[in-house]
Amino acid sequence: DKGLGFDPLVRRGLKYLNFYGEADKTGRNLAPDGVAATVLGSPVVQENGVQFTPAGTLLDTGILQSLDFTFFTIFNCPTLSQILLLSNFNGPRQSGSGTTQGVVLRTQPGSTSMTLNFSVNTLTGSTSTQRTVALGGLLANTNYLLCARFKSGQKMDFKILNKALSAEKTTDMGDPSDLGAKLRIGGSYQADLTNAGIHRFSALHTVALTDDEITKAATQWTAWANAVGVVL
């Protein structure tokens, strides 16, 4: 059991935690007092992860998006493809020109590499605006340990912790985040997007962790990956 006896070092705001690779444990929640997630569709379970594909196959955490949040994950795209890591599908309003709603953390495939996009709707009165931060150059068949953090009205950033890569946005961040939907892991919002990535583990905090807390948690996630043979 990839999560048996696991004791998280950083517990502040921790609402969801799971390690994937066993069919009957895909929706479980190892966070202190955590409530199990709802598995929708038929995830493809692999030895060290799970694929939520095609559209409609996802993990609904049941956790409402908060003003601040921090999300850790280890993922791998075997080919240059999309993987939807976190979203708040069926949110209160739509953003952009497509069907993306609310919070979206995903890769965007290119001809030779992928771009990681982190977008969050922010709200002034009745007007919703999408704030986005992105980083290119991600490769296929590579395990990435990622931390994405949103501090409402101040900043949004992410770090690929095992590759020393990061991107952030701190300007024009005065509006609060647009709330009202539950956060989901995996899935795809278009039927023709295969979302062909592998999720290794996920941890969701409903607070913006400090840099020190992120470093401590990352050390523990790295140790777990090493223990189960996920090469970072």
Predicted regions and their residues:
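Extracytoplasmic low-complexity segments
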Residues: D1-A55, T70, T215-L232
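Short hydrophobic/aromatic patches on beta-strands that form ligand-binding or substrate-lining surfaces
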Residues: Y16-Y20, T70-P78, L146-A148, I185, ...
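Extracellular glycan-recognition modules
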Residues: D24-D33, Q51-N117, T206-T215
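Beta-strand-rich interaction surfaces with strong enrichment in secreted/lumenal proteins
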Residues: L59-G62, R131-G137, T171-M173
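Extended, low-complexity, turn-rich repeat/linker tracts enriched in Gly/Pro/Ser/Thr and Asp/Glu
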Residues: P78-S81, S126, S152-D157
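Short, aromatic/His-centered strand-loop micro-motif at the edge of beta-sheets
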Residues: N117-L145
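Localized edge beta-strand/strand-to-loop motifs within extracellular or lumenal beta-rich domains
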Residues: L139-D157
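Flexible glycan-contacting loops in extracellular carbohydrate-active proteins
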Residues: E168-H199
